[in-house]
């Protein structure tokens, strides 16, 4: 169901501070960041660090916050189309640098590979669904063309104006997740880009809460319909969050 637009620009700074902390905390927590909400708030609003926090988690949180601000700046320029260059730059900023992943295979063999920041995947990636089946995302060979097609589809849809913003965000989220263009960080980038679409369309940004992680991941893994519902559900929740500030 289409939501009423809210003039988010006129909302007070305290709302945006609250949103920034909630978004950074929940989006990174879904991916395993261990910072508490209080530690996140202390870091992002007061530039202070809790002595018990892990350095990797702190750096990851700060990088996500930079990405959030990049996304907001890009969304504000409604004359500028979405580009793959921006998507890759967002990913490069999020990951900060290339890093090596070490794994032990079932037979005990050690293997490793490099995750590249801001570069489309060079290795196949997949997920085990709730039913135990393996779902293969787009291959590395297919990914560049699919991302070009996705970005063009979004820009064309905005130009044509025949689709609601929530529908557009939902379908973009679905198509992006099916591609999984990067070797790491796909979930965080997907949520940032959904919010880019919503914000540019005059809607409040959404937050997938970390305590809804299982429902979120099940929706991603279960069906086309459920994947499409995620931005709509998030929009409903964020509209409720905005009410105290209006």
Please describe what each predicted stretch is.
Residues 1-184, 188-246:
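FIC/Doc superfamily catalytic core
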């Amino acid at each position: 169901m289409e939501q009423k637009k809210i003039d988010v620009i006129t909302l007070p700074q305290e709302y945006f501070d609250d949103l920034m902390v909630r978004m950074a905390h929940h989006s990174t927590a879904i991916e395993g960041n261990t910072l508490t909400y209080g530690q996140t708030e202390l870091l992002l609003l007061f530039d202070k660090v809790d002595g018990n926090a892990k350095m990797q988690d702190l750096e990851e949180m700060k990088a996500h916050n930079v990405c959030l601000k990049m996304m907001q700046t890009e969304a504000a320029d409604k004359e500028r189309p979405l580009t793959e260059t921006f998507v890759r730059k967002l990913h490069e900023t999020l990951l900060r640098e290339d890093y090596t992943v070490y794994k032990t295979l079932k037979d005990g063999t050690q293997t490793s590979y490099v995750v590249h920041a801001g570069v489309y995947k060079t290795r196949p990636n997949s997920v085990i669904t709730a039913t135990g089946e393996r779902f293969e995302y787009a291959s590395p060979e297919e990914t560049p063309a699919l991302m070009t097609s996705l970005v063009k589809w979004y820009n064309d849809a905005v130009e044509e104006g025949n689709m609601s913003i929530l529908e557009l965000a939902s379908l973009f989220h679905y198509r992006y997740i099916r591609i999984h263009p990067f070797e790491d960080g796909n979930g965080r980038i997907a949520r940032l880009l959904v919010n880019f679409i919503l914000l540019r369309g005059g809607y409040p940004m959404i937050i997938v809460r970390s305590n809804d992680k299982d429902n979120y991941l099940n929706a991603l893994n279960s069906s086309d319909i459920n994947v499409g519902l995620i931005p709509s559900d998030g929009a409903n929740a964020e509209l409720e969050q905005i009410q105290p500030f209006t």
